[in-house]
Each structure stands twice: as structure tokens, then as C-alpha cells.
Amino acid sequence: MEHIITPKVENVKLLNRYTEKKSALGTLYLTATHLIYVEQTSNTRKETWVLHHHILSVEKLLLTASGCPLLIRCKTFQHLHLLFQKERDCQDVYQSLLRLFQPVKEEELYAFLYNPHQNEEERRRGWELISVVNDFNRMGLSNDYWEISHINKNFEMCSTYPSILGLPKSASVATVTGSAKFRSRGRLPVLSYYHKDTKAAICRCSQPLSGLNSRCVEDEQMLQAISQANPNSPFIYVVDTRPKLNAMANRAAGKGYENEDNYSNIRFQFQGIENIHVMRSSLQKLLEVCSMKSPSMSDYLTGLENSGWLRHIKSVMDAGVFLAKAVCEERASVLVHCSDGWDRTAQVCSLACLLLDPYYRTIKGLMVLIEKEWISFGHKFSHRCGHLDSDPKEASPVFTQFLECVWQLSQQFPCVFEFNEHYLIEIHDQVYACQYGNFIGNCQKERLDMRLHEKTFSLWPHLLENQHQYRNPLYRRSLESTVLRPSTLPLHFKFWCGMYNHYDRGMHPKQSVLDTLLTLTQRQVEGERTMTELQRQLAVADGVLPDPAGPINTHADQNNQSEKMPAPPVVQSNGSCAPLINGNVKEVGPGAENSNQEDREEPAANEHDLSSKDKPVFVETEHSKEEVQESS
């Protein structure tokens, strides 16, 4: 609170970027964790809550005849354009926010203050909810070819890797140690995913320190061990996710990529995904297009094309599809790396896992995938998300791109994902919120040093407790398949309005056919549940038992039978849910009965209509529960 100069400012106008007529007048509050704007109207009271950690930038604009404007941009793509009557108030809020949204130390992050009213046992169980070892066991490890190793238990071999690794059983300790020394930052080749049916594996690492002509016998033996761990293929793919020109430039700096002359039985492949700086610039250009007030169609489409954003999404998707096809169709193992193996490598490996394994398309499965491929393998969340006041050139929307790839897949396969887009958006918001400890720090070792398991809480129990909000009513377990084969033709990539225009209240609400279908299926399930309950109450009142062969049970039996239909081996992207989308909403996917009906007319998720003006108001947001007492 010592950083807050003025905790309350009245008569602040919240401007609407689409039309001046819809601008609001209200009171601005600053707390230790949130900026709160209370909009006063004749009939309702709306509150907009913005977590300080969500703020990307605060810009004080030139003084105008109407007042002093302040523009707040958020990492969640929310914009607040405030207009103060007094320049002094604007300056005080500006100075306060500069200190509040850019903490210097990890201990100042929200997670170290937040308490969801859990005891220590609940906290411990929350952190143990997701286990990478359990996921390895689910894949079938340990087996004749792969083993779970504790060789990095003290992080001495690689400080940015997890303490538990999947390694080829035939690789000796000397081979593993020598390979680690030959790889950038010690990030040696280790197991990411094992396909039990084809016995092919996806492995990940960083670039070799090969330079122009260096080689390492142990590293060559390591790749040979990976190849021998798959009896169904005589070779492995080595996939460098970088553009070839970038990889060649790194060779001059003593790094680079594998020389095929030195490694037996490898097939090398470049994928051409750009670096973090290009991606950061691309997103900035995309957001500039989104912030245009009244663009022409030509300007909008030109701006979208010039941003290159969807082109980059396609590049990541192409690489993931290549890995999935290699593992599933060619039955070949794949080794993936970029420069350090914690950005593009994480994107591609996790996307391939999602295509290959239906478990990762469930609500809990996606948590496991993020924990395994991103958190434990050292994606630098604190740097990439700008949690602290650090080098802005380290920030990049790498994880945002992965979430968008998942969303793009859900658009092609609307019935094979247990979760909806709100789940992806919630995860994205929580990554930047720092409300929970999962995404604080850059690697597992840093998190242990900060004792996050003792001082903060895990996000995953919170998401599971509220999973009814994130269920996809179209999800059909009967459509689970071994592998997804999405089309990566340009026409299949869409602009994700739900993410980048999530907070734009000025946009005209337009429901898609899918949204309408979701609403209808949810209403149907709610109606059936109500009818079942009324039937039960009537039977109790009459003193008889409900008829087990009644219409409700018959309908439920029909649904159960439909869910037991055999699944096809592969789901193509051309209309897996065509019967439902064409109007047949009779069948409802599992979990739909837990879905809440959405009202598209309601304001954004962090706005609340409150009618009470004199008594304390309890406001529950997606990031906190706080009590606000309005002075009379």
C-alpha cells in the first residue's frame, strides 16, 4: 500500500473506443492488488477489476480540453482509456501504477499474498495433483527401451531440466553426461512422449555446440541409443524448428545443428519457426489492427496480413503435424530442438502430443501436458511473460501461440476436446496473473529455491473445481481417436476474436452456429434434469417408485449406447460434428450436464452488476474475492 499515492479518485470517465456516447462516469480505486473502476448509473452499478500484474503498460497522454487521459494496456488484451478531471489525480494514479504493475522481487507477486482458504494439507495435495511421473507411467514407462531416471535429481547435469528424466535404457551414464556437455546449457536429448503402439518417441533437447566442424562421440551415441529404442524404424528424424539461416548463423558462434555426416541413421529437417523477437513484434502489429477504431475492410485485412501472426501460427502447426505423422505413420522417432529448447521446442512437442494422444485433449490432460512440456522443462515464464521489471526483449507470446494452436485445432475438431475456449482463455489469464505459483520462475530449480510449494498455491485444483464452466457440450468420447490430422491450408486458420477482442464491449454481439448449438444443448440438458427431479418428487408424493423404464431413463440409455459406439482410428478435419452442427442436437456429449448456460448479453467476465448501494458488496472475480465497502 506504500506505493499508492491516491487510493480513490471520483468523477473519472471510462472512454469507449467505438463511440463517445457509451463512455461511463465513475470512481477509480487502487488497492494493493487491483485497479477497480466502479461505474455509476441510474439503475445498476458495474465494477471493472484489473489485476496489477495483468497491466502491460501505462501511458499518460497529452492533456486535452476534456481532461487528462491515461491509457492502460493489459497482457490479457484489455484496454482502459481513462479521463481524469484533474491533472494531479492522473499523475498520482500514473506514478502508483508504474510501481504496482512492475514488481522488482518475486516476493511482491500476487501469489505470495493470495490465500484461497486452504490448509497446509490441501495446499500439499494441490501441488501433488499433477504428476509427470504418473504421465510417464501412463505411457508405459519404464519398459524394455526407456526408463525413468533420477540422474538430474540435484540439477547438477542441467539446471533448467526437471529432476526426473526419461532416457533410453541402453544409454550409459558416460554417454548421458558427455551428451549434456555437448548441448547448449546442458539440455541433452531426453524423452518427451512415447507412443506405445508404434514404439516411436518424441525427444527434445537444445542445439549442439558443433560450431563449424566440432563433434562429440557421446552425443552421437546418445542419438544412436534413441534410434535403437525404436525397433520399428531404422532412422530418426532430427527436427530443427528454426529457419535454416538462423541455425547457420549460430554455427559461426560455436553452436548450430547436427552434421549428418557424423550421425548415423538421422534425417535432418528444418521447420522455419521464427524467434521470440519476431513473434513479439508480430503480436504488437496484430494488436494495433485490433485497436483500430473504424477500419475499412481493406485496412483490416491488410493489417492482419502484415502482422504475420496467422502465418506464424501456421508454422508452429506445420511442425507439430510433421512430428505426429512421423510418429504415427512412419513409426519413426523424432528429436526436436531450437536454440535452447525451451520456446519453439515446447510449442512443437506439446502440439504433437495433443495430436497423438486424446488424453491431452481432456481438461486434466491439458494440465498434465502444460506441466510436463512447459513448466518442468524450463519454459521461462517469468521472462517471457514479464512478471518482473526486467529486460523487455525477453518477453514473447510463445505460450499464447501454443494456446492459439489448441484453439485452432478445436475449430477443426469441435467434438474431440473436452474443454472450450473459455478454459484456454482462463489459463492464459492465470499465466499473467501470478495468482498461483505454477507459472512463477523460469525452471523447476528456481521454483524449489523460492519454496513456491510452501508459500503459494497451485492453479490446477482451482480449475478442476470449476471445470463445469470449461466443459465443451459437444465433446464426444466416442470420437476419441489415436491421432488428429488437421489441415494446415491457410483457409483453415481464423482470427481468434474470443482472445484478442475479449474485452471489447463496443462490438456487436454475434452468435455463431456453434454458439447457438451449445446454448440449445445446455438448455436441453437442464430441462431434462429438471423434469427428472420433478418426476422423482411426484413419485415420492404418490408413494411409489419412479418407473425405471420411463422416458427419462430410456433417453439416458440411448445416450449411453451412443457413447459406446466404436471410435474411428483417425479423425479428419472435415466435419467430425456435421450431424450436430446441421441441427441434430438430440444427443449431448458427456459432461454437458455440468455446463453453465452463457448469456452473451452479459458484460465481460470482470464486470459485475451490483444493485446494493449502502451495504457491503461481495464481489467474486476470476482472480479474487474481495469485500468493497462504498462510503455513503
Swiss-Prot record:
The keyword Plastid does not apply. The keyword Hydrolase applies. Residues 126-500 form the Myotubularin phosphatase domain. Residues 602-632 have a biased composition (Basic and acidic residues). GO terms for biological process: blood vessel development; phosphatidylinositol 3-kinase/protein kinase B signal transduction; phosphatidylinositol dephosphorylation. It is found in: Nucleus envelope. Keywords: Hydrolase, Lipid metabolism, Nucleus. A 1,2-diacyl-sn-glycero-3-phospho-(1D-myo-inositol-3,5-bisphosphate) binds at residues 250, 275-276, 339-344, 380, 384. Residues 545-632 are annotated as: Disordered. A 1,2-diacyl-sn-glycero-3-phospho-(1D-myo-inositol-3-phosphate) binds at residues 250, 275-276, 339-344, 384. This is Phosphatidylinositol-3,5-bisphosphate 3-phosphatase MTMR8. It comes from Danio rerio.
